[in-house]
Amino acid sequence: MNRNITRIVDGIQTSDGAGVKLKRIIGSPELNLLDPFLLFDEFGSDNPEDYIAGFPPHPHRGFETITYMLNGKFRHKDSAGNEGFLSDGSVQWMTAGRGVIHSEMPEKTDGKVRGFQLWLNLPKKLKMIEPSYNDIQSGEIPSIELENGKVKIISGKFNGVKGPGIPHTGM
């Protein structure tokens, strides 16, 4: 299947949490009506001052967040008693459901911190489910070599290979 690119939208530079610099791609005024995709951010810097303040405790409700760490380290804690640790190539899958307060705090590293976070809106019937949390380590994520690159399957199925992510949205 071939598709044409009809428009290119640049993300906007902004900050979130306690001043973490990031680029918001979905969720900006240019691109904000893509339900179930609520938000898509790229974060990354070589300068610890751009990210070290992290994302102190804050609430979420009614959606899932999927964080993919390309480089760096983040520590997760939440009000449901979950704790996790993200490092190079790992994924954090958090379902906020009826509500959770959590923090994502970076740990200083010698190199660059870089990653992506996607927010997926939960269907109405699932908005009040129990919060859940899952760390997926890089070694648990299968990949497929293609002619022009490599595909990592975090969730769903591609070419007969199933990813370890368990979404509530069907994505």
Question: Which sequence ranges carry the predicted segments?
Answer:
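Hydrophobic alpha-helical membrane-insertion signals
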Residues: 1-24
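A short glycine-rich, His/Asp/Glu-containing loop-to-beta-strand
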Residues: 16-70, 140-171
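A short beta-strand-loop-beta hairpin characteristic of the jelly-roll/cupin
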Residues: 64-87, 97-101
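Generic beta-strand structural signal
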Residues: 84, 90, 102, 114-116, ...
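Ligand-binding loop in jelly-roll beta-barrel domains
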Residues: 97-126
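Short, structured patches in soluble enzyme cores that scaffold and shape functional sites
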Residues: 117-124, 137, 153-157
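Long amphipathic alpha-helical segments that form oligomerization/scaffold cores
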Residues: 122-147
